[in-house]
A protein has these predicted regions:
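Nucleotide-sugar-dependent
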Residues: 66, 117-126, 131-152, 157-170
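Conserved donor-nucleotide binding/catalytic region of nucleotide-linked donor-dependent transferases
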Residues: 35-39, 194-209
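Charged active-site motifs of nucleotide-sugar-dependent glycosyltransferases
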Residues: 20, 49-56, 84-85, 130
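Conserved donor-binding/catalytic core segment of Leloir-type glycosyltransferases
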Residues: 50-66, 72-76
Length: 209
């Protein structure tokens, strides 16, 4: 649970003794993780991802709860931006809709892939620069997507476009490893995309947080 989950549970369940409610964050042993190396070039070549662009990746469930219509708007607004490349990996109820959008618009700077085996997905992540998290803005109960952990394992800054009650983006921004926007705020998310794509040294610094 995150702090927002704890607050929600206490507020909406007064019958529960608050002293027994604790935050238990997800964690990973980073000493066992192989970080980015020269293989990234080969991985990008394998998937036809440009070597000289900043790669933003969304990996995970492609379903209605993620509010991914906004992600498509983000890609559409950056169709002429040769400095960025978007990678979407996953499966779910919205995959067909997203695939249809890709077929229609044929974005030159975006790639849609179905779910990969874990080892292949982890390799792909190592070749990316920025992790992206999306949640439908209509959520009224806090969510904390576990995909954040995969991004942090690979020392990537994150952009979280979520509802107003989830605190995953707030935590990323407060701790210096990401930015938080409301799902649907195209101006703000593009401002952060521009900032991260133009300052690779800042990306590295944020990824070390």
């Amino acid at each position: 649970m995150s702090p927002a989950n704890v607050d929600y549970l206490k507020t909406n369940n007064p019958q529960i003794n608050p002293s027994i409610i604790e935050e238990n964050p997800n964690s990973v042993d980073i000493s066992k993780i192989m970080h980015k190396n020269t293989d990234c070039v080969e991985i990008r070549k394998q998937h036809h991802i440009p070597l000289d662009t900043t790669v933003f990746v969304y990996g995970g469930n492609l379903g209605k709860p993620q509010g991914l219509g906004f992600l498509l708007k983000v890609i559409e607004s950056n169709l002429n931006n040769s400095d960025v490349f978007f990678v979407l990996v996953g499966s779910g109820t919205e995959y067909a809709k997203i695939s249809s959008w890709f077929e229609k618009n044929k974005p030159h700077n975006a790639l849609l892939m179905q779910s990969l085996p874990k080892q292949e997905y982890n390799k792909l992540l190592k070749s990316c620069d920025i992790g992206m998290i999306f949640l439908d803005k209509r959520f009224s109960i806090p969510n904390f997507p576990s995909r954040l952990l995969s991004y942090l394992e690979n020392k990537m800054p994150v952009i979280a476009a979520t509802d107003s009650v989830s605190d995953v983006g707030y935590i990323a921004q407060e701790n210096g490893f990401g930015f938080s926007v409301l799902n649907g705020d195209l101006e703000s998310i593009n401002r952060y995309i521009k900032k991260l794509s133009e300052n690779k040294s800042e990306n590295k610094r944020m990824g070390q947080k």
